[in-house]
């Protein structure tokens, strides 16, 4: 493939709260272990929208212009001299977190916890919502012909579901509660079923999102209104016939985490995926006296190979998650759509010559 000419790298850049712009960035120079990618499909994540609206997520503050995007797939156009496993023309999915050093967390395989990690579209690191993007070749995964670019981009949220189910030790025959029917809740549902969960119930405020959960495999759905966490937990137990061994909380809402504690079977596990306020009130004694283990999830690690295999074997289907598509030139409109909650997953197509999935 011919190298891109200078000035062709259209990128979506956040400058601060409420300020995103399409700008031309330089084509990045490769290091010896890097690849240059022609981006194809990039999904909009809630964190992208949050950086646009607020200019920060917790301690991560946008202090200089930053390219957004971290759910991505593209085509290799150039490789660094040390790269042996990829070549120009290869289609790849991008794992956005790359350790900058081999620290204690990397040595035990939990590189997602390394404090100095590079992570796409987390200040100060640029993301990949652009025409051309440089990434570490070791964190680019070749896609089989049977897996589309959009499926490759969806490996990022799918990885959150895989990692959450691993942290919860979801296994054959388990009953599972998923709190939240957004993109992360939906992929968690898909993974839990693929890992052998016998019954999965999904709860959410939105009837339309619960309908999507039912469409893709939820055994039961419960629409939450003004019930107390105790009452919701009783409904969960009623539809399942017993309390779930594993609850995976994907909203971050205080009441939802409380529901997770009340709903989970004694000796079971509550996995907290959703990021809410730093301080929340929890019925901790209720968890302690019933030995409900509470585990956190921060991004993911060691999930891309499994995700590629699951998609290639058609073990699960993530295609229904994509509800809207926009060309890169209309990325601001795409973000408006995502902000309004009009779709489940909004996908941006970065290659002007290929708008296919």
Curated annotation (Swiss-Prot):
GO terms for cellular component: cytosol; extracellular exosome; membrane; mitochondrial membrane; mitochondrion; motile cilium. Substrate binds at residues 51, 156, 299-300. CDD domains: sorbitol_DH. The keyword DNA repair does not apply. Zn(2+) binds at residues 45, 70-71, 156. Keywords: Acetylation, Cell projection, Cilium, Flagellum, Membrane, Metal-binding, Mitochondrion, NAD, Oxidoreductase, Phosphoprotein, Zinc. It catalyses: keto-D-fructose + NADH + H(+) = D-sorbitol + NAD(+); xylitol + NAD(+) = D-xylulose + NADH + H(+); L-iditol + NAD(+) = keto-L-sorbose + NADH + H(+). Homotetramer; dimer of dimers. This is Sorbitol dehydrogenase. It comes from Rattus norvegicus (Rat).
